[in-house]
């Protein structure tokens, strides 16, 4: 049977998805299922790792069935995943010892504060992992599990526990425990991986008291990791041939193969990445240095700005405040008024990411008067997404010395034309939206397809992408500067709110 399709496994923060692509990049079928968000305490966020696997395996089978594609027609599987979220499980039983601790979770802030008391070690972490010390990353989450789950430390020291980011957890289950591996992009998000020597950093592991025996093998982003177990997908042994964290996969899906090319993904969070080539660039502006992907043992590096809350603020005004009935309604209400009338909403629900890195910042609405209506709050929530993206992209310009020559965008929120136009205005730059909005999944299948020869080279990948719409700035630079000053003032009000 001919291998006409590639399956993207897209495991996100709020849902598990499976997308079947053909050779022209067309989508044959998408299946999606949401799963439970667990909030045990304020600032804590967890997922049930078994529910993640259950929903993910379920949507894979659903996509094949309703897409009328047989497992034998799948040339390869590409995995892309929510990053930093980490699972620790029993090597023998495959059972997690605790829920997955999600990237948004702030429970390890006190551990990070302890690390920050040693400036030399903080410097070592930045220079060798490319990251800042923050509860966002996997390393301190693993330490917390080992220190707080009964018996976990003893089992880990005895070599009985394994850890991994979500890609590793899925690969383990897809292969029924035959493969314990991750890729360079996901490894670079743990705060445990040395992006210069390209190996797990023993000094950091020792500091956090994490046994190296727990850690997965690190492989190229485009490489055959193994094959699915015959019991997993209808008896077929399908190569798992592409793996990348969601934002890295999106950069690859946008075909940002050249140095200086950038993209922004608008999902639960908001993430901008710029390809900086084959050597890491370290930021003075609060950006992260990360591995975008690796091929043949050679990494491509990127600068990244991470915004914790983007699309999630629209979920909040829908579910938490009841201001809209659907996310789509937000555009309607935002366009009923000409401005926010001086209202700013800073969605620092779990702190602030780039460039502020304030774990203790909290959400703030400022500028409210007796005339403030729900439309102003809704519009301010949308504008906050664009302002946060501008914060990040301004830092990239400072670190690289490059002006932003257009931005490629993807994610659910790019369907909101008001947001995209406001983003173009506030950046004073062109915004390009591709016809294929499933860029993250596309990046995963591009990586997998190259590994198995489904596509011959990157030039062929570029021919698959086409632009749907280009947004041009419609607001003058002086007005933009005035509005942005207001945003920066609002951010200052939100800082250090939850500090002990």
From Swiss-Prot:
- Classification via InterPro entries: ATPase_NBD (IPR043129), Carb_kinase_FGGY (IPR000577), Carb_kinase_FGGY_CS (IPR018483), FGGY_C (IPR018485), FGGY_N (IPR018484), Glycerol_kin (IPR005999)
Please list the residues that bind ATP.
13-15, 268, 311, 315, 412
Q: Alphabetically list the UniProt keywords.
A: ATP-binding, Glycerol metabolism, Kinase, Nucleotide-binding, Transferase
State the CDD domains in the record: FGGY_EcGK_like (cd07786)
Organism per entry = Francisella tularensis subsp. novicida (strain U112)
List the HAMAP family hit by this protein, alphabetically: Glycerol_kin (MF_00186)
GO MF term list: ATP binding; glycerol kinase activity
Q: What is this protein called?
A: Glycerol kinase
Residues that hold sn-glycerol 3-phosphate according to the record: 13, 83-84, 136, 246
Spell out the SUPFAM superfamilies in the cross-references: Actin-like ATPase domain
